[in-house]
Amino acid sequence: MLLSKKVIANFIPTITKIEDKKIVEALNAIGAEVESIKTFSMIDYLIIGKIFTIKKHPHAEKLNICSIQISDNKFINIISDSPNLFDQTKVLNKYVIVAMEGAELPNGITVINRDIRGMNSSGLLCSYADLNPQSSEYLSEYDSKNIIILDKANLGDTEVYKYLNIDDTIFDISIPSSRPDWHGIRFLAKELAAYLNLKYVELIGRAKQTDFHQINFKVLDETDNKAKYFGGIHLRNYQLQQSSWNTKGILINNHIKPINDLVDLSNLIPLFVANPIHIHDADKIVGDVRLVQATKKEQFLALDNKWYTVQENDLLVVDDEKIIALAGIIGSMATAVDENSINYFIEVGNFDRHQIIKSAAFHKINTYSANLFSKEISLYQTKKTFEYLYQYLLTKVYNQQLSELSKTFSVDEYHQQVKVNYDKIRSLLGSMNYLPDAMIQKSLTDLGFLVEDDLVYVPSYRNDIYNWQDLVEELLKILNINLFQPIPIKADYLLEVNNETNELLDRLSKKLRSLKFNHIRTYNLTSKKRAELLNLFKYQDPVVVSKPISETRQYYRQNILTNLLEVYQLNRSYKNKLYPIFEIQSLLTKNGANHHIGLVMANNLFNHSYDPSSGIKLDLITIKGISDIIVQNFGFNCNYQTINDDTYLVKNDSLKLVVYDETIGYIGKIKKSILKEFDLADQDIYCLDINLERLITSINRYVRTYEAYDHYQEVTRDITFQLKNEVDFNSFINVINSFNKLSKWEIISIFDATNQIDTNKTYQPTKYTVRCYLKQGDKTYTTKEINQIFDELIDLMKTKQILI
C-alpha cells in the first residue's frame, strides 16, 4: 500500500515537521511494515509566473506567444503550443510554472533561450510530465497534452513542487491482514498520531445537512445478504470540471489517474476510509437501480473498453434495461460520465468480499475498487464515506442539488466492550510501578478506544480485539517498554547449544565478506509469484501463512535469488552501484527446512568505481571459483555438469554443482526475461544458489547424548575409515548406532587421500576419522577389556565392508 505524507497531514497537520526516519520508526512500531520510501528530487531554475497576455505567433498557427510576469517588474516572453492556452478567458491572470534558462528537467531537456520561427522564447512553460516524467503514466489525456495552470500561487515563488504535491514522501507499506481498516489512512493516522504524540484532527464537519431533495428513482438490494449496504446520493445540475492540481498531485502520488473533479473525489475519499465509490450518469439510468446476483450469462462493455461475460452469482448493479456495473469491481460504459453529464448517481456499497474476490479473479480484473472490496469493510467506514461525500460536495454545490441517502442506516461508534484489570495489564507488561491507571487509559483513548473506568469500548471498525490481552498488544504500540524498570529473570537451568552449524555458516560468511561480497538479510515471506520465481530446485507448493500481514507477505519463499534481485532493483532505482551480495538463510518447504546460500553479481569483482572494467572479470569461471570456495568450506570438492532446463538461467552459460552424484546447487547467468521483472534487463547478472543442508549434515549427522558428570575418566579410541563407492555416510551411522557399548561418537576430521591398499578404487577417496567414547556406567574397564570392545566394533565395521 502507498502511504502519502501529504494525505497523512490532513489528519496529523504537524507531521510535516517530523523526519521521514521517525515516521518509518513509528509505522513499524504500530505494525505497518515499511518496505521502501520514495521522495522526489527538486529542480533549480523553476519559478511561479503569471499569464499577463497571450497572442498568436505571427509565423505559426499552433503556437502562442505568452507574456509571463515572474516578479513585480519583470516580464518574459515564452512560446508554447499547449492547447489550453488557446482559450484566453480561462487562463489569463492564472499562474504557471516556468523553467528558466539553465533548468535541467528530469526528462533530459535543458532549457535555453532560443529563437522559434523568428521570435525569441525565454524559458519553458511546464507540463506535469516535464517535472515528474516517472509518473506520466498516471496522467489523463488532457494533462498529458497541456501545461499546468494554477488558480492560486505566489508570484515569483521558486518552491514550485508544493503546488503539485510533488514535494511529498511516499511510504510503501505492508498492512497486517487483521487491520483492513488501515487501507483507509484516517484509521492508520489515528494510531500513528498516538505513537508520535501528535494531535489528530477529525476532518469531517458536524454541520447539520438540510434542504436535500428526494432521489427520483428507487435503489434496491435484491440479493440474499450479499451486501451490508447498497445505496447512494443523487447530484443534479452540476457541470464537470478539472480538479485542482493539489488534488491531482495527491492522486498521481497514489498511482491513480485524475479524470474530472467528481470522479477524482470518488477516488480521493477511499484513500481516507477504504470504501470505494462509483459515479453513474443518472440521465443514462432507466427506471430503478438494483443490486442483483446474475442468473445467466450476459455481456456488458466495461469502463476499460473491454467486453465481459458475467457468470452466475456475479454481483451486478442493473437498471430496468441493462447492466450498469459489475458491483464493487468495474462500471459499465452504459452509464459512464462524460463532458455532457450534469446529473449523477453516486453509488456507495459494502459488498460481500468473498464474492468480489471470486468475480474479480474469474474476470481477471484488478481495479483499485476490487482490491479494497476484497478486504473486510466495516459499516462504520461506509458511514464515514457518506460524511466525507457530503462535506466535500457541499463546498462545490448548494444543498438543493444533493439528495438524501437512498437508504438510511445507523452504526454505533463502538461495537463491543472489554473488562480490564489494570494490575493484570501492568503485570503482563512487566511494570508494576511505572504505569498508573491514568496513563493506560490515556494511551488507549489515543488509540481510538473509549475508556470508562474498567470498561474499554472497541471502535466499530476494529474486529481484531477480543480480550484484555489484545489491549496490551495495542499498548505496546505506543508505550516505550525500554523505560520500564527491568525485572531480573531467575533461571535454575542452563541450555547447551549445538553451535557447529552456526560456526560453519559464520566462517563461510567471513570468507565471502573478505572477497568484498556484502552479506544481507531479507524477508522470508513474499508473494506467490515471487515465491515460485527462480525456483531452481523445483520445490513444490510454497508454504502459505494463514493470516499474512499482506498479499506480498503471504508465502514462504522457495529461493533467495528473487529477494537479492529485489535488493538490486531498489538500489538501481536510487542509482546506487550494484555490489556483489549474498544471503544465507533456511528455506521452509512442506518437506522441511534447508539452509541455502544465494549470491548475485552484476560487476567485475574487486573493480574500481572509476574503472568498471578493472578487477576480476564477471563470467562463469569467476562464479565457479566462488562456488568452489563455498563447497570447500565444508570439506568437500564438487563436480560441474551442464544444465538441461533453461527456464531461469542461460543454458550455455550455466552449470549445476554435483557432490557424490547429488545436485546441490546451480550457478550461471540469469536470463534477460527474468531480469525484466526487476527492471534489470540491461544488466548481465550471474547468480549462485546452493543447498547447504547436505554439506552441513554430512559432518554434523551424529547423535549427541548428554550425561550427568561422573568421576570416571573418558575412554576413547579414534578410528579412520573409508566407505565403498556405492554407499553413503548413512551406512556407517547405521553400524555405529547398532553398537550399544558406546556412549557417543563424533567426527574429528575429514580429508581426501589415495590409498595404496585400494588398488581397484573400490572405495571413496574421502577418509573419515571418528572418536568413539566407551559407555562406562559404574564399571572401571581394564586395558584388555577396552581393546576387546573396540576390536568388536572394528570387526562389525569390516563385516559391513567399511575399510579401516
Swiss-Prot record:
SUPFAM superfamilies: Anticodon-binding domain of PheRS, Class II aaRS and biotin synthetases, Nucleic acid-binding proteins, PheT/TilS domain, Putative DNA-binding domain. This is Phenylalanine--tRNA ligase beta subunit. CDD domains: PheRS_beta_core, tRNA_bind_bactPheRS. Belongs to the phenylalanyl-tRNA synthetase beta subunit family. Type 1 subfamily. Its EC number is 6.1.1.20. The gene is pheT. Tetramer of two alpha and two beta subunits. It catalyses: tRNA(Phe) + L-phenylalanine + ATP = L-phenylalanyl-tRNA(Phe) + AMP + diphosphate + H(+).
